[in-house]
Amino acid sequence: MDETEWIHRHPKAEDLRVGLISWAGTYLTFEACKNTVTATAKSLGRRQTWEILVSNEHETQAVVRLKSVQGLYLLCECDGTVCYGRPRTSHHGCFLLRFHRNSKWTLQCLISGRYLESNGKDVFCTSHVLSAYHMWTPRPALHVHVILYSPIHRCYARADPTMGRIWVDAAVPCLEECGFLLHFRDGCYHLETSTHHFLSHVDRLFSQPSSQTAFHMQVRPGGLVALCDGEGGMLYPQGTHLLLGMGCNPMRGEEWFILQHCPTWVSLRSKTGRFISVIYDGEVRAASERLNRMSLFQFECDSESPTVQLRSANGYYLSQRRHRAVMADGHPLESDTFFRMHWNCGRIILQSCRGRFLGIAPNSLLMANVILPGPNEEFGILFANRSFLVLRGRYGYVGSSSGHDLIQCNQDQPDRIHLLPCRPGIYHFQAQGGSFWSITSFGTFRPWGKFALNFCIELQGSNLLTVLAPNGFYMRADQSGTLLADSEDITRECIWEF
């Protein structure tokens, strides 16, 4: 079977949310208990996150509503006060959003014509005359592990560590080199590659963030972003090989990228240690002893459902076909492409929509033959496009803090957790300094252990996972800010975005 053209998926709604930073460096915040809106928060959390709902958009402006994660809207009242709730009329809560050249936004109430502003604490809408106090800096609220897709060239950005360059030439974002960490510091963005180098204003990668790696970001509703140096230079693909570099003359909107959460690509191994791979004519076999491009599958899963779709690098989905064979020829909405997943100590068991479990036949074909699963129906699963994790929970990112010796779960800036595979589904967690994660008798963690411990990872969604710690409990985010492993059951505080 020939490959189909890789179809880029639009960002999910949660990837399109933003935080809005006032001139004072504080975030627009809805106060759930007071029904008020303030701008006192110093970091981006759930209450500082807004979904931009567009009803009409032009090149430099759009008519929008701002919706909180609770489902309520930012509202401007006749007396200039700002609150949140449900709109009473068709224009109540509507703002004219203008995009400014300095990467700022202004929000003008559609009814009164007044601008949304803050004094660094309170938020109100009283002035008709535009000033610097009305400027808001949008910050994308999606997870910091991202990919960049060029809708003009229909390719993804890819870092080349051997040449120290970034190219926009990847048709399928299945490689670790397509993932980047988007750091936000002092109002600017730093783009870090998977090998921990930074994109710069000049034609090479830097080993450390600096003023030469700091970019301003223009943000548009719908996930579109453009990176610039603040002095007229824009970042866009150049030349026949589409080298990502700084220039002043992008053509046809080449400077715009769709910013998305880095997808999850995995490999599956049979009991015999062979990789599940797509072979000639869409056949799927456990035939390869080495990992290759056709052994990679995008893990697509709705967190509300225990079913998963596995999208191969040829653009098709694994699907159960006649004679119970599994083929890589499915399409997104076909019921036969959905498999129910079961977990056993980090190994995955897949059940077809017709009830039978996937296993390896004597001729090495992947088949949906078995009614009662056994070891032959368990597959080892390994991350294929990431050698590290960045975990975000209910209260923020997992990371270290200068004020604590324990690992925290409420940080604005995350730490990388380097993954050292032990066996399928089981990893050692290594801190950024090279030492290992250790666990105390209280179920807390420190980042300077001498010995490697086993952590069991199980996927719960497209970019969601749980971690079973060495003490036998699930790792969870605690409201105090301390990372704990003390949960016998999987609760919402045990679910981690990665």
Swiss-Prot record:
Pfam families: Fascin (PF06268). InterPro entries: Actin-crosslinking, Fascin, Fascin-like_dom, Fascin_metazoans. Its main location: cytoplasm. Expressed in testis. Keywords: Actin-binding, Cytoplasm, Cytoskeleton. The keyword Cytoplasm applies. One of its GO terms (molecular function) is actin filament binding. GO terms for cellular component: actin cytoskeleton; cell projection membrane; cytoplasm; cytoskeleton; filopodium; growth cone; lamellipodium; microvillus. The keyword Cytoplasm applies. It is found in: Cytoplasm, Cytoskeleton. GO terms for biological process: actin filament bundle assembly; cell migration; establishment or maintenance of cell polarity. Belongs to the fascin family. Acts as an actin bundling protein. This is Fascin-3.
